[in-house]
């Protein structure tokens, strides 16, 4: 049996990635970040539904002032499951969210490390495992992979997602992207070689996991996979004729992923029409107001505000690509034709990177207008997440090809160490968060109640609502100084209401996905359960 050997370069990368997460170790939480409160109270309501027996949650009971809302019909659930693991282990909601970010960040760094090693030559791993007669020496391929991982971890928009936006699903999506490209690239490059069923299954599962992490991944991440498939098939076609087996494998991988994703997509398509979804693509979520000006890609500006200037001149949040990433992209542009390894991959990344920058710019508005489903993405600048992957992978490949020889010694490899350190230092000033104390009400239904009071325009209505409202019979319970909640079991008072006849409410209860109680009626009458009506409720 072969002895398991740890990769010291991977361990080095994971250790060097930890400073990017330093604010997560501090007391407090980013409640004032764009999605900071959502990341916490979504997990709180997800946990309440899990504990109430809904293993695939759909309902978030605290929304709409206690009437509830099918939040998890439109919010992809996988990120919440990651946090839920830590909640069930006994950790607090906010600590669980922080640990989910930790897992996602390290998984993403590991993924792009593995992809870079793969693109620069898997034989390097075999050579490393076998050892060398000359004794230990630095490995240029894995050091380039470490550089890619650091570029990805410290990419400015990754820090934006963590500390400016505090967006759980968006940040965890970054963990999937390199693994997704790696899985599909192996599926296409190795084709029908032995082991193809395993590679097919892995590719399908990784794509399904990506889609189940964020609702907009189908419209943003999936097209990236399509570009990779087209790139590899075109390569094979030029050499050996049309690659039928690879084409079938790619289609099968996508189809299997969609079959898994159907558990989320089908209810969304069937029942989403009962929700007033215009609120999610209008007002502050209108993509027309969130394109990125070219200068913003290069601007060193950093702030914790919003993308609130339609022309981009005074946006309160940063959209920079990062100094090191830009320099390495320019270097790659001028050296790609002379690259010794991964030349085709560098060319692919350059084309995709330029395409992403175009799609985020105002020049692409006709494209967004012509494809209405793209409005679901809401913010064109969200594609900076993909740019981070593209330019980080490109940076690692470019760095290796800048080395003086194919089998570099210690001296040229030192340049990789320096560039990896520069990737960290260039973004180090941005590793900061606006932290607030974690008060008890921040982790129960009062957090949702308070948010809806501050943002009544964010109320979720169904098609059965004829008149907008901002308070319910349950609002007073949330505002009460005596409010107490354990895993979503409040507010119960006011949950049952006798609307006709005479009687009294003996007891009532509420859970994450259920509500009810006992009523003693003196005459025939009608009892209303104060919960939003929606298809699927069982009485």
Predicted features along the sequence, with ranges:
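Membrane-interface helix-loop junctions at the exits of transmembrane helices
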Residues: 17-28, 49-55, 91, 144-165, ...
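Periplasmic/ER-lumenal interhelical loops and adjacent helix-loop junctions
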Residues: 246-249, 253-336, 438-499, 503
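Hydrophobic/aromatic-rich transmembrane helices and adjacent perimembrane loops
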Residues: 102, 170, 219, 373-401
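Signature aromatic-anchored transmembrane alpha helix within multi-pass, membrane-resident enzymes
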Residues: 226, 254-258, 354, 393, ...
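Active-site-proximal, structured, solvent-exposed surfaces of multi-pass membrane proteins
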Residues: 481-538
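Membrane-embedded helix bundles of polyisoprenyl
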Residues: 12-21, 72, 99-119, 138-191, ...
């Amino acid at each position: 049996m072969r002895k398991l050997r740890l990769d010291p370069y991977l361990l080095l990368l994971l250790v060097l990635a930890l400073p990017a997460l330093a604010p997560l170790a501090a007391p407090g939480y980013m409640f004032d970040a764009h999605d900071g409160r959502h990341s916490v109270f979504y997990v709180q309501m997800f946990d309440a539904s899990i504990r109430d027996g809904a293993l695939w949650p759909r309902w978030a009971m605290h929304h709409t002032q206690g009437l509830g809302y099918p939040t998890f019909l439109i919010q992809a659930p996988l990120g919440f499951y990651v946090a839920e693991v830590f909640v069930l282990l006994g950790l607090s909601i906010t600590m669980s969210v922080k640990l989910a970010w930790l897992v996602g960040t390290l998984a993403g760094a590991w993924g792009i490390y593995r992809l870079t090693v793969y693109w620069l030559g898997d034989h390097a791993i075999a050579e490393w495992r076998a050892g060398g007669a000359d004794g230990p020496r630095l490995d240029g391929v894995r050091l380039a992979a470490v550089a890619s991982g650091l570029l990805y971890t410290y990419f400015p928009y990754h820090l934006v997602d963590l500390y400016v936006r505090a967006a759980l699903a968006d940040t965890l999506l970054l963990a999937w992207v390199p693994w997704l490209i790696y899985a599909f690239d192996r599926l296409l490059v190795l084709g029908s070689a032995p082991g193809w069923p395993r590679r097919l299954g892995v590719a399908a599962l990784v794509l399904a996991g990506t889609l189940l992490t964020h609702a907009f991944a189908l419209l943003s991440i999936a097209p990236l996979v399509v570009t990779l498939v087209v790139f590899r098939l075109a390569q094979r076609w030029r050499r050996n004729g049309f690659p039928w087996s690879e084409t079938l494998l790619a289609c099968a991988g996508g189809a299997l992923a969609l079959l898994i994703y159907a558990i989320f997509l089908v209810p969304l398509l069937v029942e989403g029409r009962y929700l007033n979804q215009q609120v999610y693509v209008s007002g502050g979520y209108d993509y027309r107001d969130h394109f990125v000006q070219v200068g913003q890609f290069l601007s060193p500006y950093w702030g914790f505000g919003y993308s609130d200037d339609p022309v981009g001149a005074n946006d309160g949040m940063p959209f920079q690509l990062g100094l090191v990433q830009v320099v390495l992209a320019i270097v790659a542009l001028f050296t790609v034709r002379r690259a010794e390894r991964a030349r085709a991959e560098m060319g692919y990344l350059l084309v995709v990177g330029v395409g992403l920058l175009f799609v985020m710019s105002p020049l692409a508005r006709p494209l967004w207008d012509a494809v209405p489903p793209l409005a679901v993405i809401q913010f064109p600048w969200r594609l900076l997440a993909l740019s981070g992957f593209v330019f980080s992978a490109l940076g690692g490949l470019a760095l290796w090809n800048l080395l003086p020889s194919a089998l570099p010694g210690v001296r040229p490899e030192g340049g990789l160490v320096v560039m990896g350190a520069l990737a960290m230092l260039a973004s180090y000033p941005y590793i900061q968060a606006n932290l607030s104390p974690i008060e008890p009400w921040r982790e129960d239904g009062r957090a949702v109640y308070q948010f809806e009071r501050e943002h009544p325009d964010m109320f979720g209505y169904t098609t059965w609502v004829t008149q907008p409202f901002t308070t319910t019979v349950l609002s007073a319970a949330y505002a009460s100084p005596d409010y107490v909640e354990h895993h979503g079991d409040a507010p119960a008072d006011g949950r049952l209401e006798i609307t006709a006849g005479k009687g009294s409410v003996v007891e009532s209860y509420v859970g994450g996905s259920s509500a009810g109680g006992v009523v003693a009626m003196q005459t025939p009458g009608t009892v209303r359960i104060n919960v939003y009506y929606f298809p699927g409720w069982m009485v």
